[in-house]
């Protein structure tokens, strides 16, 4: 009875959604070179010391626009060089900087691994739950921590933390208390910005951890902030997406998911910013495109299931998965479906594009490599649920359920 009721509820939820809105390439869609066009440059960081390897993948989604697209890199099939056993769920991908892969486990361990060998260089046991990627800038790792276990606890007394570490030694530089925090940090303009379960978006001084501003949304904030062209964009469980001034927290605009029988979908996913647009999925099963300058709805596209995954932006397409088990390539200007890949399991994790190959994992614990242009299946790997992969241009670092794999092409 419960299963039947849930199925009926979901069917009603989908069928009563607002109609999909078809977009136009002539309205708030920028393809020429400029600040609103797609770039693949990682988030800006100060130059590393000459003796240190470079910063390659400094933040969740590769850059602060959260584009999730790396220009070039290894191609499948792959073989494994080494693997690191995390001991608990690896829900979000690592960063890669100074020759170190830094990743968090769901049970609160933050570990910095030698990218060449997989050996741990330092480890921090927080005693808290974690559901976020760290960020790296200026030889500092910034990490988000949730409440202490149980991880599904609720209550006003719970809190979270943002902690800053020396990237090479793991020494704690500062820690700040925020609400329960599963928002991957955004580092830009001397600030570290996160969202939390209290509905707050908080900016902390990157050097000291002192709060600089706070903005309250209407409900929980679980996604990471995205930043482009002087606008910090983030979604909320109240069904809204807001654009804020990144230095002051002042509200620039507020947009909403489409209404259905008196309610709206909520935004868990992290937005991607490209072409003068905001691209983000919602729990009403739709992917939305809003104008980055105006906040106006430019298109919406139904997927048949919750969209917890964040989108990757490749060329002029939006690549995103759905709980329906379908993975979509959507036209970035109009929302039209370019192609669809049907996987045998719900898709909750976010995809990443490396070269012209898109990687996505399913809750059935399989990672798929697809041709980004056509959706053709190129390779599968029997592990992975959420985190997909990152690269340094030579290796593929694939996030399994509890293991991180370093891989190179076969042959």
Q: What are the residue ranges of the model-derived segments?
A:
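Extracytoplasmic beta-rich repeat domains
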Residues: 20-23, 82-96, 122-137, 144-161, ...
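Blade/loop signatures of beta-propeller domains
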Residues: 43-80
């Amino acid at each position: 009875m419960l299963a039947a009721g849930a199925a009926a509820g979901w069917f009603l939820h989908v069928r009563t959604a607002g109609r999909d809105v078809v977009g136009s390439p002539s309205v708030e869609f920028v393809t020429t070179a400029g600040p609103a066009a797609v770039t693949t440059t990682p988030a800006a960081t100060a130059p590393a010391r000459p003796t240190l390897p470079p910063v390659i993948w400094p933040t969740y989604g590769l850059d602060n626009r959260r584009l999730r697209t790396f220009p070039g890199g290894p191609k499948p099939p792959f073989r494994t060089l080494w693997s690191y056993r995390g001991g608990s769920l690896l829900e979000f991908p690592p960063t890669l900087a100074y020759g170190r892969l830094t990743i968090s486990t769901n049970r609160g361990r933050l570990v910095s691994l030698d990218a060449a060998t997989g050996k741990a260089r330092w480890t921090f046991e927080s005693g808290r739950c974690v559901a976020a990627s760290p960020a790296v800038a200026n030889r500092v790792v910034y990490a988000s921590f949730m409440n202490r276990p149980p991880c599904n606890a609720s209550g006003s007394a719970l809190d979270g933390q943002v902690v800053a570490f020396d990237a090479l030694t793991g020494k704690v530089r500062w820690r700040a208390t925020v609400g329960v925090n599963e928002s991957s940090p955004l580092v830009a303009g001397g600030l570290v910005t996160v969202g939390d379960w209290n509905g707050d978006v908080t900016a902390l001084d990157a050097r000291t951890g002192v709060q600089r501003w706070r903005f309250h949304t209407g409900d929980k904030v679980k996604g990471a902030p995205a930043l482009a062209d002087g606008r910090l964009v983030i979604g909320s469980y109240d069904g809204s997406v807001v654009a804020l001034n990144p230095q002051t927290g002042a509200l620039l605009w507020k947009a909403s998911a489409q209404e259905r029988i008196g309610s709206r979908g909520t935004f868990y996913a992290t937005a991607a910013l490209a072409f003068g647009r905001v691209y983000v999925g919602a729990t009403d099963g739709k992917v939305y495109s809003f104008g980055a300058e105006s906040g106006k709805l430019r298109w919406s596209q139904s997927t048949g299931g919750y969209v917890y995954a964040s989108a990757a932006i490749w060329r002029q397409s939006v690549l995103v998965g759905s709980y329906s088990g379908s993975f979509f390539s959507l036209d970035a200007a109009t929302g039209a479906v370019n192609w669809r890949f049907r996987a045998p399991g719900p898709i909750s994790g976010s995809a990443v594009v490396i070269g012209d190959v898109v990687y996505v994992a399913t809750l059935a614990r399989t990672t798929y490599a697809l041709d980004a242009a056509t959706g053709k299946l190129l390779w599968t790997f029997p592990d992975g649920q959420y985190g997909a992969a990152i690269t340094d241009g030579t290796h593929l670092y694939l996030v399994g359920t509890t293991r991180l794999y370093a891989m190179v092409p076969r042959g």
